[in-house]
Amino acid sequence: MGQTIITNDGRFEWDEVKNIQNIEKHGIDFNFAIKVFDDEDKIEEYDDFHSTYNEERYRVVGMVDNDILFVVETELESGRIRIISARYAEKIYVDKYFLLRGKNYDF
């Protein structure tokens, strides 16, 4: 496990080694991915399949700079959000985002 990075506002954290691996694999930096939480139309869902007794995980799908991102996170006892992974959303989640929000794909 690498160094834990905490954002200046204390709202988010992540493992920096995991962030570097995520950038290499998906091309998304966690510092960029946290902007998904600013999207008022974001979709947040409990991830029952990947959650455990010790860690509840959530999927967040939202728009950042005209791209739809898929972020996996967990909420810590402190209230801070820990980013686990981030990638560009697959078509099924892009479709769901626009369908639920009544938006067009034109951007």
Sequence positions of predicted segments:
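Ribonuclease/tRNase effector modules and their secretory precursors
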Residues: 1-107
